[in-house]
């Protein structure tokens, strides 16, 4: 694990629709070791390594969940709307960063009423999104605007990046900066002259998998590996039958989500790779969400796709948690798969006539 790269990516502010900071990091990281960097019309990052053989894409979405400024009141408080999926109880009194249209960063906090000022009835009622506000310490609308805040500015969560103990990493936007970091590490280390390897940082995944569709049309890959996160069910309050993934027990192979089924031959090959390398592998399903695989698998008449996810605690909140061991196991698994891939193997993924 390149922990320095992951920290740099997690600390970037890159809400859906405003992914430039992550895009810049990927450009600076990968430009020295790839043949070409291009972008689709929405801004998805596409790096190409090699120029012969089947096109194999490794995809991690760049965007994170966040907010957008929708109103500045007379007292300088900001009203906002959510971008991506949020639970209102995970938001109050958390720090945020407003990224202005000119690229300046302004700190803020989602305000909350002190318990002393709440009635017993109010204490039992969750605050709705519409009642929340962000305090940037401004005394008036004029002061907020003078600092550069405008309607339409993007807002990202704010949290410290840290390593806890020997194995855990805690930070914001692990969904899905881990996919971006791993994609970059694979582009740096995999050298297979039999394939053309693409690294994709897709945009706007959290609001409808949009960059997956546009980047798929841009590349027209022959096989795709989607890297993402998935709910870890190893904490109190989560149904661990519906959400069986556990930190430290290996990466998860997504058997289906709301928009995708994996190519079963691709699944079999990855299972064999894991067994051959003595790597742990878990399995999960997701009925209420989707990964970029849901757009890639229906591109151009259909393509073989598989989504591999890191178990992650506290998704879509200020601070998530992953296991270094899970990350390293997934990196080893995909590196082995990509290094041994040939045109014959890629073609076999799409052969559906049974042979006696």
Model-derived features: where do they sit?
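N-terminal hydrophobic/helix-forming segments and targeting peptides
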Residues: 1-356
């Amino acid at each position: 694990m390149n922990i320095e790269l992951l920290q740099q990516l997690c600390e970037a502010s890159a809400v859906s629709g405003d992914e430039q900071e992550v895009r810049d990091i990927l450009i600076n990281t990968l430009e020295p070791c790839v043949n070409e960097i291009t972008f689709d019309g929405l801004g998805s990052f596409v790096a190409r390594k090699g120029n012969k053989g089947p096109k194999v894409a490794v995809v991690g979405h760049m965007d994170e969940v966040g907010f957008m400024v929708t109103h500045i009141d007379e007292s300088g408080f900001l009203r906002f709307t959510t971008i991506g999926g949020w639970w209102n109880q995970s938001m109050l009194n958390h720090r945020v960063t407003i990224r202005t249209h000119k690229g300046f960063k302004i700190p803020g906090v989602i305000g909350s009423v002190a318990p002393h000022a709440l009635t017993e009835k109010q204490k039992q009622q969750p605050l709705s999104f519409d009642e929340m506000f962000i305090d940037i310490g401004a005394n008036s609308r004029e002061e907020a605007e003078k600092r550069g805040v405008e309607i339409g500015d993007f807002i990202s969560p704010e949290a410290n990046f840290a390593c806890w103990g020997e194995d855990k990493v805690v930070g914001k936007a692990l969904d899905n900066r881990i996919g971006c970091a791993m994609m970059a590490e694979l582009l740096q280390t995999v050298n297979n002259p039999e394939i053309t390897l693409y690294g994709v940082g897709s945009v706007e995944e959290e609001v409808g998998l949009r960059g997956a569709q546009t980047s798929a049309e841009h590349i027209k890959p022959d096989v795709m590996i989607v890297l993402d996160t998935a709910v870890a069910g190893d904490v109190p309050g989560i149904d661990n039958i519906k959400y069986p993934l556990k930190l430290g027990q290996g990466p998860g192979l997504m058997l289906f989500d709301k928009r995708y089924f994996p190519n079963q031959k691709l699944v079999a090959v990855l299972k064999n790779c894991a067994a051959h390398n003595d790597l742990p592998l878990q399995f999960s399903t997701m009925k209420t969400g989707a990964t970029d695989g849901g757009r890639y698998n229906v591109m151009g008449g259909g393509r073989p796709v598989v989504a591999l996810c890191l178990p992650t605690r506290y998704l879509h909140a200020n601070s998530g948690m992953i296991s270094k061991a899970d990350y390293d196991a997934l990196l080893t698994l995909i590196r082995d798969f990509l290094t041994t891939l040939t045109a014959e193997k890629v073609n076999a993924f799409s052969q559906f006539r049974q042979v006696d």
